[in-house]
Amino acid sequence: MKMNVTATVSHALGHWPRILPALGIQVLKNRHQPCPVCGGSDRFRFDDREGRGTWYCNQCGAGDGLKLVEKVFGVSPSDAAAKVAAVTGSLPPADPAVTTAAVDETDAARKNAAALAQTLMAKTRTGTGNAYLTRKGFPGRECRMLTGTHRAGGVSWRAGDLVVPLYDDSGELVNLQLISADGRKRTLKGGQVRGTCHTLEGQNQAGKRLWIAEGYATALTVHHLTGETVMVALSSVNLLSLASLARQKHPACQIVLAADRDLSGDGQKKAAAAADACEGVVALPPVFGDWNDAFTQYGGEATRKAIYDAIRPPAESPFDTMSEAEFSAMSTSEKAMRIYEHYGEALAVDANGQLLSRYENGVWKVLPPQDFARDVAGLFQRLRAPFSSGKVASVVDTLKLIIPQQEAPSRRLIGFRNGVLDTQNGTFHPHSPSHWMRTLCDVDFTPPVDGETLETHAPAFWRWLDRAAGGRAEKRDVILAALFMVLANRYDWQLFLEVTGPGGSGKSIMAEIATLLAGEDNATSATIETLESPRERAALTGFSLIRLPDQEKWSGDGAGLKAITGGDAVSVDPKYRDAYSTHIPAVILAVNNNPMRFTDRSGGVSRRRVIIHFPEQIAPQERDPQLKDKITRELAVIVRHLMQKFSDPMLARSLLQSQQNSDEALNIKRDADPTFDFIGYLETLPQTSGMYMGNASIIPRNYRKYLYHAYLAYMEANGYRNVLSLKMFGLGLPVMLKEYGLNYEKRHTKQGIQTNLTLKEESYGDWLPKCDDPTTA
């Protein structure tokens, strides 16, 4: 049965308590319960006023039954109507008597709540030291508190809990808000909320400015810091109604909405809509949360300044008020200052004093020199002031000497559209010019939902992760540990990551995810030669992630790599500047089809190297060209999961260390290093009664008696030419055995150095020469 939206809503009138459960949306009328949209444990209430399926949630807002279906299923109004129509087709039209009864029931509930409010208010006492207000920073604030117990909203309220009386527009007490010591809040069952408020009267700016705040603690904070009148709306849902009423009562007042800054953006949107309705302004706190959160974090003076900064109108451009004569009479430095003011003092110059950047929407964007020069020329033209290219260049060059110098972005910050995440402590902050962010992830950081998992809430990332790990849980944990190392910038673990595998196995996605976690500003690409060269190392300073793509052809001892990952100071010799020594505190991530080959036998590389192999090559038809973009949109979930999973960072470190000597890593090293592969054919004996070391001059060779002879035979049998000298073989042997978990022992005898090593049985079939001569056997 096809129905339009209006007809569906009309047909559903009075039936929502049956319709919603039929769609899988469980609701209980007039009970605080988990929100079916955001998952909040007790912030949702279904009141079904006038049979319209009405509801409200402190986080999601309010609406009717159709709006709830839209939000739960994430569909358009027409699609929501189709879902509702599918279960209402057989229902009879709503009986007008039922609707009238619902209205009467609502009126009766309001009257009962108002009467109960009067009764409870008569049993309150005025006092100080309320536990909730003390926690909010106001231990000396006089307030109304319960003198006995009361049951409301599924909560047992105790003596001493805070009571906030709510009045309608006629000044009549119609409801109460009860607030416990731990911050639980309820109003009386069936009581009026929309259009009600509690007012904190102030003396300052009386009749000139009026504040509206969401919660009581926020209102108390604003009132305390400004001395001005503040109305308490209780929630963002009531802001619009209260703002309209305030404008009717106070037509000449400036109305300011002291809104909450929510991660979801809901508080900001509701406040903006209310401000539009009353021609008011919105004042957002400098933290995520409310103005009381800012007060408790930064103190009174800083928060008072932030409040007045938030309502200060934007400064006019001096070019709107100056005359041509005034501007022309100015010195070059004065003209540069006026231009700086025109741009809202949101300009900075790079460390070299050449490139200008402008702060916009959370990031410092580089201004192309020619474009900026044309903009400055446009300001001259606006005033009809004479100019030349030389004059414009002179003003721009002078401006570069006046404005602040751009700093490097903090390594611990990851930028999102709606703020920055501090990866050291997991806190999320609003954007600030002082963060010096140059790029942002083009997604919003979102609040967690109950039961959040990677599999459900980051499906694209999960598919990549599970495929890269071959479906093995322990391998997934290792990959996540590597990503956490990048996220937390744990260069101090003295490890470096090497991801290997065939083309199309997901290695590049690993590098892209690592870049997102480190932040685009904090990541750079290089070659391993860059790490080894003092001249080229200058390009690596200031980054927290160094990517080394496609390094498999490189072969060397990795001295620079060892020094950087070991936390040693390395020499840097930049062009046209004096050489110096510095630490490069960065995580190094190499991405190769084949593992790198190191000639170092001291163990300096092996004890820092973590190899993660992606064995499966994804078929071309299965590859998703949009995978990176999809994972980018899931970044907030990924970050939360990593920080929660590795709340003890040492768990991630131990996983990476266990990966170093895993069978997978050993097999990769064996494929890359023939000497290391040969060591895999050795096993230890309880005593030093095994093979002798031998040397190259002993003739004839005895491959079962002399270890060095066996090594030469292995290299020859497999066609390898570059064999190690006896000395280098002897030096590297203990280190390589240790990677296999074997202890090397030796003793000096008359026949030479005897070891505790012997050849494994598989040596005879794989490469050991077959000879019937017992002297060579």
UniProtKB/Swiss-Prot annotation:
Alphabetized CDD domains for the sequence: TOPRIM_primases
GO cellular component: DNA-directed RNA polymerase complex
Protein name: Putative P4-specific DNA primase
Subunit comment: Homohexamer.
Organism this protein belongs to: Enterobacteria phage P4
Tree of life domain: Viruses
Domain (Toprim): residue spans on this chain: 208-296
E.C. number: 2.7.7.-, 3.6.4.12
Gene Ontology BP, a term: DNA replication, synthesis of primer
Ranges annotated as CHC2-type zinc finger: 35-60
Molecular-function annotations in GO: ATP binding; ATP hydrolysis activity; DNA binding; DNA-directed RNA polymerase activity; helicase activity; zinc ion binding
Role according to the record: This protein acts as a DNA primase generating di- to pentaribonucleotides; the predominant product being the dimer pppApG. It complexes specifically to the P4 origin of replication (ori) and its cis replication region (crr). It also acts as a DNA helicase.
Catalytic activity: ATP + H2O = ADP + phosphate + H(+)
Keywords annotated in UniProt: ATP-binding, DNA replication, DNA-binding, DNA-directed RNA polymerase, Helicase, Hydrolase, Metal-binding, Nucleotide-binding, Nucleotidyltransferase, Primosome, Transcription, Transferase, Zinc, Zinc-finger
Gene3D superfamilies in the record: 3.40.1360.10, P-loop containing nucleotide triphosphate hydrolases, Winged helix-like DNA-binding domain superfamily/Winged helix DNA-binding domain, Zinc finger, CHC2-type domain
Pfam families with a match to the protein in the record: D5_N, DUF5906, Pox_D5, Toprim_3, Zn_Ribbon_Prim
SF3 helicase domain sequence ranges: 474-627
Binding residues annotated for ATP, in chain numbering: G501, P502, G503, G504, S505, G506, K507, S508
SUPFAM superfamilies for the chain: P-loop containing nucleoside triphosphate hydrolases, Winged helix' DNA-binding domain, Zinc beta-ribbon
